[in-house]
Amino acid sequence: MVKIKVRSSAWYDGVDNASHRSYLRAVGFTEEDFAKPLVGVLAAWSELGPCNYHTLDLARYVKEGVKEAGGVGLTAPTIVVNDGINMGTPGMRYSLISRDLIADTIEAQFNAHGVDAWVGIGGCDKTQPGIMMAMVRLDLPAVYLYGGTAEAGWLGERELTIEDTFEAVGSYLAGKITLEELKRIEELSFPTYGTCQGLFTANTMAMLSEALGLALLGSASPPATSARRRAYAVASGRAVLKAAELGVTPRRVVTYDAIYNAAVTLFATAGSTNAILHLLAIAHEAGVKFTLDDFDEISRRVPVIAALRPAGPYAMQDLDRIGGVPRILKKLYKAGFLRPEALTVEGETIGKLLERWQPPAVPEDGILYSVEKPYKPYSGIRILRGNLAPDGAVMKIGAADKLKFEGTAKVYNGEAEAFKAVAAGEIKPGDVVVIRYEGPKGAPGMPEMLKVTAAIVGAGLGEAVALVTDGRFSGATRGIMVGHVAPEAAVGGPIALVENGDKIAIDGETGRITLQIPQEELERRRKNWTPPPPKYSGGLLAKYAALVQQADKGAVTTPPR
């Protein structure tokens, strides 16, 4: 039996804790169980969407692994906000907020009940970083387990993901497809439970869980429906008690080098821009100093080697059949891009794990490329700065064909206004659509603009217009899109001062974004600007707006460690 039961002894050992033991006997504990390590199994579960529909089932398999390793597992839930269902609605304001709430609920549950170690099972976009933030915050032995991607859909020979449905709406509004064609894509694009199928935010964060060393190597890519997904659940249950025996805790794993490796992987795969926010937040919880300047430096050296949607044509299940995330990591490791001494929850360095890992004997089929002959010669994401974003902004250049754009501002104080303009055909080639007051404090909650961006792409304007916002983008976004503009409009950032007709220049090569007006005019507008009143005076959204920091700080709500 594993001899790590230390913390839970204060809750469950001794005469004075007899009543505590009574409670656990009521849920099935035996006398022998009280001598075992208590392992929490955190399931981000919900039937309000497919992403986390099956996590309770995975929790059963995790508990099997815990039992095999000599512990006893108890399942606890956390909240889920499904981004895709809330896209373009007031509910999207709760998306990023839920990340921090998830970390808080895990801290409350597991610290209140004295667990010795835990496994976190996440599916959708915010459950994953929320769990990882909690891992480093609690610093108990812990392993992350991804719920897995949904299978791709098919329309004849065409592979479909949920991205196709979002963009089909824009195509229908532009008169390019019929309502019946839209309906057919809607019906076929998401055939199973699991997360969105491309390298959107959920699959990006799953990939980065391996790069960070918080998940078992190879565990990110098997689909939610795969038997291998359940096998990784059992293995994660065993692994967390091995980590406890070895004294491996998340703050030993999440070092500067681990965040560095995750950033390299993000840029090499053209993953979701949301990962920048989440990695900043994870680093914040770990007490690791990692800033946009670090991301910027790394991004200027790393090419894109993965042709995964939305930057390429392939889905996560396609990557899985050629070996999954380790095949990417090994390429980066052999090319000298990774820091191999970073520790993982498996108790070994990522370099040693990758040395042993061998790819399956199947061709890469254009899904992956070499570092020497990459899919794209530049990074997937660029950090921008300039007089429109003094504290930084992000641009997903890996999913755009043009890196430079200069155009005329059309300004909208919110996503709903902008979507109406796109639907009405008011957006023309050469426009820079500016959507503001959608930042962490201003919205509040920094919602994603996928409804607008997908409509723009679906209308055939993806490379003809640009979009700039203090909000966020979905990982499914493609085109010339700049987000996370900091400072945001609500706190008086320069984006609040943009007027219709202003010229804006975006340069993804040099990393600059410029509002082309004289400094004197900018100062005149600043003097005339008044902050808008808060949108909420009570409840969760008001509390969040009061606490949240800016996007360049990860939009966190807790003080620095």
Curated annotation (Swiss-Prot):
Swiss-Prot/TrEMBL catalytic activity: (2R)-2,3-dihydroxy-3-methylbutanoate = 3-methyl-2-oxobutanoate + H2O; (2R,3R)-2,3-dihydroxy-3-methylpentanoate = (S)-3-methyl-2-oxopentanoate + H2O
Annotated InterPro entries: DHAD_IlvD/Edd (IPR050165), Dihydro-acid_dehy_C (IPR042096), DihydroxyA_deHydtase (IPR004404), DiOHA_6PGluconate_deHydtase_CS (IPR020558), ILV_EDD_C (IPR056740), ILV_EDD_N (IPR000581), IlvD/EDD_N (IPR037237)
Pathway involvement of the protein, from the record: Amino-acid biosynthesis; L-isoleucine biosynthesis; L-isoleucine from 2-oxobutanoate: step 3/4; Amino-acid biosynthesis; L-valine biosynthesis; L-valine from pyruvate: step 3/4
Cofactor: [2Fe-2S] cluster; Mg(2+)
Keywords assigned by UniProt, alphabetized: 2Fe-2S, Amino-acid biosynthesis, Branched-chain amino acid biosynthesis, Iron, Iron-sulfur, Lyase, Magnesium, Metal-binding
One Gene Ontology term from the biological process aspect of the record: L-valine biosynthetic process
SUPFAM superfamilies: IlvD/EDD N-terminal domain-like, LeuD/IlvD-like
Entry-linked Gene3D superfamilies: IlvD/EDD C-terminal domain-like
Positions of Mg(2+) binding: D83, D125, K126, E448
Keyword Iron annotated: yes
Chain positions found as N6-carboxylysine: K126
Catalytic center residues: S474
EC number(s) stated in the UniProt entry for this protein: 4.2.1.9
GO molecular function, one term: dihydroxy-acid dehydratase activity
Free-text comment on the cofactor: Binds 1 [2Fe-2S] cluster per subunit. This cluster acts as a Lewis acid cofactor.
Protein residues bound to [2Fe-2S] cluster: C51, C124, C196
Family per record: Belongs to the IlvD/Edd family.
Role played: Functions in the biosynthesis of branched-chain amino acids. Catalyzes the dehydration of (2R,3R)-2,3-dihydroxy-3-methylpentanoate (2,3-dihydroxy-3-methylvalerate) into 2-oxo-3-methylpentanoate (2-oxo-3-methylvalerate) and of (2R)-2,3-dihydroxy-3-methylbutanoate (2,3-dihydroxyisovalerate) into 2-oxo-3-methylbutanoate (2-oxoisovalerate), the penultimate precursor to L-isoleucine and L-valine, respectively.
Subunit structure: Homodimer.
Protein name: Dihydroxy-acid dehydratase
High-level lineage: Archaea, Thermoproteota, Thermoprotei, Thermoproteales, Thermoproteaceae
